[in-house]
Design a protein with these regions (language model features):
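Membrane-embedded alpha-helical segments of integral membrane proteins
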Residues: 2-48
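Hydrophobic ligand-binding cavity/cleft-lining segments
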Residues: 5-14, 22, 47, 53-134, ...
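C-terminal/domain-terminus segments
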Residues: 211-236, 259-264
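Short strand-connecting beta-turns/loops that link adjacent beta-strands
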Residues: 93, 145-146, 158-159, 201-205
Length: 271
């Protein structure tokens, strides 16, 4: 079993070194490969011990992955809609927090904190900029590696709700920017919609929640859901941390009277 697992690790290292797969893809498949390699080693060892040494047995077993490959490719892609939500407490009023959501300029890497998905190569957000007014306004998010996409506003009620649907124009995701297994609106995952909800807490601060819905189109639904949710939760954590930092800085810069008298307006009349 140890030999099989070691062989799998060497195979994955070779895939990365020869640039056949990116680091993101390697990290995604490591658990599956290690489990499959270990099980394969156990089965192969059991067959070897039961039947003794046979020169034709090992080559026959080695051909099994190639025989099952076409069967897997022939299986239809399944689809499931999944939802991920993260919440953070912010020491600023909902009005102040809401005003930080539309335009998020010049994001510095240190503002995002540590993120596992960014560590393995997922591009970091650079800025988000709102264009237009009211419902139908477009918030354009730009990431590293020239990745960008749009969020079309579907509901805006300051300081309670900001919702949007995702739009990924053709050419917005450079082919080399993301591994195909985590590509936005690629063969495996598709972003549907999302948004922020804000609730005033007892201390006058804000409970800010970020929700994203995505479609899992992979054949391995359970595994795809696991990684899809892990990636989004990690990304949500970075964005919510950024909103917390900027909102609390903005709140501390306001005079007390402004915090108490801040009007509640509709985004439609403000943008």
């Amino acid at each position: 079993m140890a030999i099989a697992a070691s062989a799998m690790c060497l195979f994955l290292v070779a895939m990365f070194v020869t640039l056949l797969e990116g680091l993101i893809c390697i990290v995604l498949v490591v658990p599956v490969f290690l489990v499959a390699g270990s099980l394969g080693g156990l089965v192969g060892g059991a067959i070897h011990n039961a039947k003794g040494t046979n020169r034709s047995t090992l080559p026959a077993l080695a051909l099994l992955p190639f025989l099952f490959g076409p069967i897997e490719n022939a299986m239809p892609h399944q689809r499931s809609v999944e939802t991920v939500t993260n919440t953070i407490h912010i020491g600023a009023s909902p009005e102040v927090v809401f005003d930080q959501l539309a335009d998020v300029r010049a994001i510095k890497p240190n503002e995002l904190g540590f993120s596992f998905v960014h560590l393995i190569g997922l591009p970091k957000p650079v800025e988000a900029q709102m264009s237009g007014t009211g419902l139908g306004a477009v918030r354009t998010s730009r990431w590293e590696k020239n990745v960008w996409f749009q969020e079309v506003i579907t509901m805006a009620d300051r300081p309670r709700v900001l919702q949007y649907r995702f739009v990924v124009p053709k050419g917005a995701i450079p082919r080399q920017a993301l591994d195909e297994h985590v590509e936005i609106n690629g063969d495996y995952f598709e972003l549907v919609d999302g948004g922020y909800t804000l609730e005033r807490s007892a201390d006058g601060g804000t409970e800010l929640s970020l929700t994203t819905r995505f479609v899992n189109k992979s054949r391995l639904q359970i595994y795809g859901n696991l990684w899809g949710k892990l990636v989004l939760k990690d990304f949500h954590g970075s964005i919510l941390g950024l909103m917390k930092t900027r909102s609390e800085i903005a709140s501390s810069a306001l005079p007390s009277s402004a915090l108490l008298q801040h009007p509640v307006k509709k985004l439609a009349s403000e943008l």
